[in-house]
Amino acid sequence: MRRLKRLVFVGALVVTASVTAAAVATTPGSNGQIAFRRWLNDETSRSALYTINPDGTGVRRIVPRLRRAHDDQPDWSPDGRLLAFSRFPDDGPAWINVVNSDGTGLRRVTPRCTRKPAPNRVPRGCEDAANVSFTPDGQHLLFTRATGRVRQFPRYEWDQIEHAAVATIAIDGTDEREILRLGRYAGDVKFPQMSPDGRFILFERHNSPLRKPRMGQAIFVMNADGTNVHRVTPWKLRGGDNPDWAPDSSRILFRSQEEADAERAQFYTVRPDGTGLTRLTNFPKKHRRVFSASFSPDGAQIVYARANDDRERGDLWLMDADGTNHRRLYAVPAADSAPDWGGLASSP
């Protein structure tokens, strides 16, 4: 099945369940390892997940790569003991995995598809599950799932899935529930993430050609039970690329111009009510492009991926939380991106 592009619109919203959460995801001063994705070929069709220490040492592959698939979207559990990620096969729907921080105990969380879906349809039981993140209690995962028929929009070079939803599931694969579902062919959601205090869920919304502004993109926030959905970033910024909560839940970190003009991308923060929009960076155009970012657990630093003017491939960089003091963390010939900064692993 051709990988579906993901768009977002919250129209004809149906609230079906709530998610409860406990403590914050990480505690101040508990900076642990950074997980990230490494592209293994120039076509960005093969990738694997790695971890690295905050000082740039200890790079290692966290889980063996499955043939004819790529692993993406790593997210640490609040206690730093587990890593959740999405696995995208070449032919078929994506699914969610969880693995121990040392690379052992790999297990599938979302259900296995028992039949091969048609190229233009994703039936129930074969939902495309991706964009995973832990809830603050460490026992559940938020993710997006897509199902239904695929509608093509040739003018926009876009394939739109019929139904898209934000859902939650226990890490043992039980208790799967929807939090919200979008209207038919209205768009799709990406990267739902619950605030560390458990009050809110952020997500990206990309309008389909059927909604205005057509192909628009912005970040939205809703209550943890799926109510009070509201936009927090201007449409013109096209904010997204795996937004991240500050450890104290006060701000949302995001990149502008996702999937639009990457050479004009900058990092911003905004409050969950949409106020306090602050630009953190002033990259010149010659920096080529930047990618998604993640707060450190103590809230003092940010890790992000950046392709310099002399390199087309991304390296991992650090900056202070106010957007200053940029320094390269690690550089290799491969392309590294999609970092997630975890806390120090606690004892069992």
Residues covered by each model-derived region:
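Sequence signature of WD/YWTD-type beta-propeller architectures
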Residues: 2, 13, 21-348
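Bacterial N-terminal signal peptides that target proteins for export
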Residues: 1-8
